[in-house]
């Protein structure tokens, strides 16, 4: 790696992100380490996302029909246009937490064996974002964690260990372009990032996690999205890692903690606090329903699990673009 001046391409798949895309692009352009190019794959936006992107000379826009979008293949398409030594993947409704996001991603490439570095998502303090998820750092001490296994070692890991090692997130991740060419994302309706992490590890590469490489990213979820996201995530984690998870349970103490967090959020009115308490209650119930259907289907065998996944998640979960308390 050319530490003095690495070349970096950014790839962003988007659709109808007019409300947030400028914050995303401006955040990238304000980084302490500049990028070579920003490649945006737009899959049929019907708002003015594309028009806003045309204001930036550094942005290359590739337009595809919405029916051609796929979580894995669309990202591969973006990578095929990239010229940088490194490729960052993010999304149009995310923005860097600070101007050292790229620097912190690069910091993980201190070993030639590292194929990619992943950061974390955090939720910005805003009354339209779930206050239970607001980023409240307790400890500023962070460290880079690396995973590397032989194929035999990886296969001997428990499902929990596999899930932990592959908790990849391409909302905030940097890759060696050469590795993405060697190991592209699979065609899949969901979890393309976690599957890629497994493929990279099985191929003998090292992957790294740096919690200092943060982006702001948040989805206002309705019950249908939470249910589908829960079910499809469990499905793919089981298929690739053998992970079954545990049925979520909310204790009285858990409810009291949520109530306390919301109650102590001074930025919210009493009406807003009530809204967010009900919101979290509804999302927990939707998540629990996803777990229940997964568990019940799995007890009847893989065929039933595949059938239930097609039934409920044949159309992948799509997050809401609006996050209005009035909803």
Report residues per predicted region.
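A conserved acidic beta->alpha catalytic loop
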Residues: 42-50, 94-95
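A recurrent flexible, glycine/aromatic-enriched loop bordering the glycosyltransferase active site
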Residues: 151-175
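Glycine-rich, basic loop-to-helix element that forms the pyrophosphate-binding segment
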Residues: 65-82
